[in-house]
A protein has these predicted regions:
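Condensing-enzyme catalytic core mediating Claisen C-C bond formation in acyl metabolism
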Residues: 1-21, 30
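Conserved catalytic cysteine-centered active-site region
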Residues: 4, 51-104, 108, 112, ...
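Buried hydrophobic positions in well-ordered alpha/beta secondary-structure cores of metabolic enzymes
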Residues: 6, 31, 42-45, 86, ...
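A short, structure-level motif marking secondary-structure boundaries and short turns
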Residues: 12-14, 47, 78-79
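Metallocofactor- and cofactor-centric catalytic cores in central/energy metabolism, strongly enriched
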Residues: 18-25, 41-47, 52, 59, ...
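Short, well-ordered amphipathic alpha-helical segments that serve as non-catalytic structural scaffolds
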Residues: 21-36, 60-61, 89
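Short secondary-structure boundary/capping segments within folded domains
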Residues: 35-39, 54
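Short acidic capping loops at alpha-helix termini that bridge into adjacent secondary structure
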Residues: 38-44, 75, 103
């Protein structure tokens, strides 16, 4: 038996006033509820997040612990792979499940690109390319 996706959640797309933490919490709570799991059953969190200076928080994986107090002390890992950061998080969680180290994983892909003007976002996105 391999890894499978059993629940999901997402925010609407667009220019949202929510900060990064609010986006993480809102979508992850929805995914946990949709999956029908208790947060105590989650034994690993993988977060795909490309920063590149888009937000001031350089350590967003710890923000996942705000989703539910029951997630306190749950290992949370951030993966960054430019535009494929969310996919990298899925692969990381899948590998942990298939290895037997994790039974139930929470995978989060998050980005906040509307906190800067066009020039600022362009400069941030350029950091994902060879310079």
């Amino acid at each position: 038996m391999g890894a499978r996706i059993v629940g999901w959640g997402h925010t609407e797309f667009g220019r949202l006033k929510d900060d990064l933490e609010q986006l993480i919490v809102r979508s992850a709570r929805e995914a946990i509820e949709h999956a029908g799991v208790d947060p105590t059953e989650i034994d690993g969190i993988w977060m795909g997040h490309y920063n590149g200076g888009l937000v001031n928080d350089g350590f967003p994986s710890s923000l996942a612990l705000q989703i539910d107090p029951k997630l306190r002390f749950t290992p949370s890992t951030r993966l960054e792979n430019a535009c494929a950061s969310g996919s990298a998080a899925i692969h990381g969680a899948r590998n942990a499940i298939n290895s037997g180290n994790t039974k139930i994983a929470l995978v989060i892909g998050v980005e906040k690109m509307t906190g800067k003007d066009t020039k600022g976002v362009t400069e941030s996105l350029m950091t994902a390319s060879y310079q």
